A protein has these predicted regions:
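Loop/turn elements at helix/coil->beta-strand transitions in domains of secreted/extracellular proteins
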Residues: 36-43, 118-125, 218-223, 253-257, ...
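Acidic-and-aromatic substrate-binding clefts and catalytic sites of carbohydrate-active enzymes
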Residues: 132, 201, 230-240, 266-267
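Conserved alpha/beta catalytic core and glycan-binding cleft of carbohydrate-active enzymes
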Residues: 136, 242, 246-247, 255-392
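A cross-domain feature marking catalytic cores of carbohydrate-active enzymes
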Residues: 47, 126-132, 227, 260-262, ...
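Active-site groove signature of glycoside hydrolases
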Residues: 128-132, 206-234, 334-338
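Short regulatory "switch" loops immediately downstream of catalytic or recognition motifs
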Residues: 64-76, 144, 230-232, 289-296, ...
Length: 393
């Protein structure tokens, strides 16, 4: 269950994966006046679709907003017993995320949020995780979430006869039932990689998802694409897919924005037929971080010679900005902080390490707000779209 935060100056509690850490669409709606007062023009949400994790980059159902973010109309069942690892016993979670009343009500709340954002002149961008899904996903259902649910087909983990068998690549097609030989993204068995080249049905489904959420009645204004260059098993297919993706999205909503998470040279995807732009790591976040803090963006390394190194800063910016067409550069996501890296303010303390080894309190020790303000001045005046991570304001 979500928690209400009463003291925003207090350091968050130590991470608890079973305790969805607060925040939902109703909360965003309640803060619309505040967001409008700040001058916010676009709300970019991390994944909102059904998922058992807090981060939700392991999608369980692409067709519905997670009821923990949306609306729980009907509740039931019990939380999973402490120290239990059998997800079949997660009856409370299963009841919430398979109940169609909860799912439909959550989608309706998202519609309301987008309508309110549009009324105030704001736009809404969704996070699309299409390279992989989660092991909880209804297509795989390794965790047996949908075993007893109505109107759901058997998952590919359980049987070769599943209608979703082709959605995944199994190294051993004779290892059913409960086939553990499916391909996981970077070897993670909780993140089954989607098998587009061998499944026209999967490709059609995801393209329909892309179209659905930027069309009435949902009317989102674009997509941010997670690990977009990893999708598929070849560069040839990757480019082909994103061309198809662009066609269906732009046909449904010509004004929709398509941004990709990408590290390295994005030129091949920014030819006007795939992505509009990218999260600007190479030509903004990284050089800004090295120049103003001397820190690597995860806080994993400090290099004294990079701090204040104007020559390196200028050369890096010039080199990587040359990879962009002007139109792509002007809408590139210029971030100082985001969900994948330490906060910029934390980097100003020059402490090397993460919460796991330093403790959460270290993130706020010895920080320099003056450096943060310098960074924001540059961010707000640099070519591109200044993008604030929730809380940095």
């Amino acid at each position: 269950q979500t928690k209400q935060v009463e003291n925003w100056d207090k350091c968050p509690e130590d991470f608890d994966v079973a305790n969805f850490y607060g925040g939902d669409l109703a909360g965003v709606l309640s803060k619309m006046d505040y967001l409008e007062e700040l001058g916010v023009e676009v709300l970019y949400f991390n994944p909102l679709f059904v998922s058992a994790s807090s981060h939700k980059y392991d999608t369980q159902d692409y067709d519905y907003i997670d009821p923990h973010f949306g609306v729980i109309v009907e509740d039931g069942g019990e939380p999973m017993p402490q120290d239990c690892c059998d997800n079949r016993q997660a009856s409370l979670y299963k009841a919430r995320v398979t109940n169609k009343k909860n799912l439909e009500a959550s989608n309706q709340l998202f519609i309301k949020l987008v309508e309110e954002a549009h009324r105030r002149g704001m736009r809404v961008i969704l996070d699309g995780v299409f390279n992989h899904c989660g092991s909880f996903n209804k297509w795989m259902d390794r965790e047996k979430i949908y075993d007893d649910a109505e109107d759901f087909e058997p998952g590919a983990f359980a049987t070769k006869d599943s209608p979703y068998h082709s959605y995944f690549h199994f190294q051993n097609d004779n290892a059913f039932p409960d086939n553990l030989t499916y391909e996981g993204w970077w070897g993670h068995d909780t993140l089954p990689k989607l098998n587009y080249e061998e499944s026209p049905e999967l490709e059609a489904y995801i393209l329909n998802v892309a179209k659905k959420w930027v069309s009435p009645p949902y009317n989102a204004d674009g997509w941010r694409l997670d690990v977009a260059a990893d999708l598929g098993h070849s560069q040839e297919y990757n480019h082909l897919f994103w061309k198809k993706f662009r066609n269906v999205v732009k046909e449904a909503n010509p004004e929709a924005l398509i941004l990709a998470e990408h590290y390295g040279d994005p030129k091949d995807w920014l030819q006007g037929d795939q992505w509009d732009s990218v999260m600007n790591y190479d030509a903004f976040m990284e050089p800004m971080t090295w120049f103003l803090t001397g820190m690597e963006k995860h806080s994993d390394e400090y290099k004294d010679y990079m701090l204040g190194n104007i020559e390196n800063y200028e050369n890096t910016m010039t080199h990587y900005m040359a990879s962009f067409a002007t139109s792509s550069l002007q809408c590139a996501m210029n971030q100082l902080s985001n969900h994948d890296h330490s906060r910029f303010l934390t980097r100003t303390n020059h402490k090397v390490g993460r919460a796991a080894n330093l403790g959460t309190q270290a993130a706020s020790e010895g920080v320099n707000k003056g450096i943060m303000k310098e960074a924001v001045v540059i961010q707000m005046t640099w070519p591109g779209a200044p993008t604030l991570y929730y809380g940095d304001e």
